[in-house]
């Protein structure tokens, strides 16, 4: 599994309510994604950063879904380019679901 962190700069003056509205609008698109395991939608108004933390089956899946059309959506919605970081994620402890995911070695 791969954890991907996507970050972008927020427009000046954006509100918490506006961020939540943007995130809610994107929910159906991500719910239908067969390659994504989990997504956390994040923002910090104080630092002016927003983005997402994704859990994918593979880095290829992450790159396929975060293509040019995704970049254009971020540019259109927030006026900034997204940046991407990828991390190998062999173990996940999910206390809410009382689940542990361990990738085979």
Where are the predicted features?
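Short S/T/G/P-rich N-terminal loop/turn motif that feeds into the first structured element of a domain
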Residues: 1-50, 59-68, 78-105
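A common structural junction motif
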Residues: 72-76
